């Protein structure tokens, strides 16, 4: 993010690389992380071009804030709806291609199985959730972008269908399952406030970087936490 380091606090590709490696407990693949750090500016530019309304300072430049234990303020945000606005921007860009006829979209479909031909993925079997019909889709290349499996945990900010079913279908057909510990769940998320909400809400990470801490609502709950911690360790 050094090219967008408007506050001039000596941010660089290497500092972003190091923070990401450290945040991954030094288990991440360094080549991939460094490439991510290199193209991070381009990713922000692409999001802006898609219409993501990132916050700006009074001079009109994109604003930054501290987030996730980083050494410097390098996080671009859109009020308290950053993730949602990123999704809206991505879906809007995709829908423009759908309208042009260059991309076909099949909403309300659930992946049931992966199709292999001579050991290579060549398509999927899916169910139409509206009609219940089983459909098949062939392709020269198959990319599984299922959003992880964070919803196997009781509290998670992942979407409700991020339940591990797609990863399991691929694993059954011989795909390697690497680093299952890399799961982001945010157990301190806020419960849903209505039947129409498909995921929980995160507040803890940004508040922590602003110096806030989580405390029990009742004083006596502190002892319960300490006793539970003592038994755990």
Residue map of PLM features:
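Charge-dense, low-complexity intrinsically disordered segments
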Residues: 27-30, 34, 77-81, 157
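N-terminal amphipathic, basic-rich helices that act as targeting or association modules
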Residues: 34-41, 49
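A short alpha-helix-loop-beta-strand transition element characteristic
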Residues: 27-32, 46-60, 102-104, 176-179
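Terminal amphipathic helices with adjacent charged low-complexity linkers/tails
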Residues: 55-87
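Gly-rich Lys/Arg/Thr-decorated short loops/hinges at beta-loop-alpha junctions or inter-strand turns
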Residues: 24-28, 66-75, 146-148
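Residues forming the flavin
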Residues: 1-15, 56, 79-233
């Amino acid at each position: 993010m050094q090219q967008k380091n408007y506050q001039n606090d000596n941010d660089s590709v290497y500092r972003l690389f190091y923070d990401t490696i450290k945040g991954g407990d030094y288990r991440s693949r360094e080549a991939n992380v460094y490439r991510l750090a290199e193209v991070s500016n381009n990713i922000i530019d692409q999001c802006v071009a898609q219409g993501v309304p990132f916050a700006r300072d009074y001079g009109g430049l994109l604003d930054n804030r501290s987030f996730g234990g980083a050494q410097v303020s390098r996080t671009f945000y859109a009020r308290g709806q950053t993730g949602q606005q990123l999704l809206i921007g991505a879906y809007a860009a995709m829908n423009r291609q759908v309208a042009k006829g260059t991309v076909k979209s099949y909403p309300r479909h659930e992946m049931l199985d992966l199709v292999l031909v001579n050991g290579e993925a060549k398509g999927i079997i899916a169910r139409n959730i509206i009609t219940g019909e089983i459909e098949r889709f062939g392709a020269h290349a198959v990319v599984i972008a299922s959003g992880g499996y964070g919803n196997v945990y009781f509290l998670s900010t992942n979407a409700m269908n991020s339940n591990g079913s797609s990863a399991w279908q691929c694993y059954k057909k011989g795909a390697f399952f690497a680093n299952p510990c890399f799961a982001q769940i945010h157990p301190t998320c806020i419960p849903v406030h209505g039947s129409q909400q498909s995921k929980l809400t995160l507040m803890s990470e940004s508040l922590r970087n602003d110096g806030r801490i989580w405390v029990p609502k009742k004083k006596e709950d502190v002892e319960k936490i300490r006793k539970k911690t003592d038994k755990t360790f």
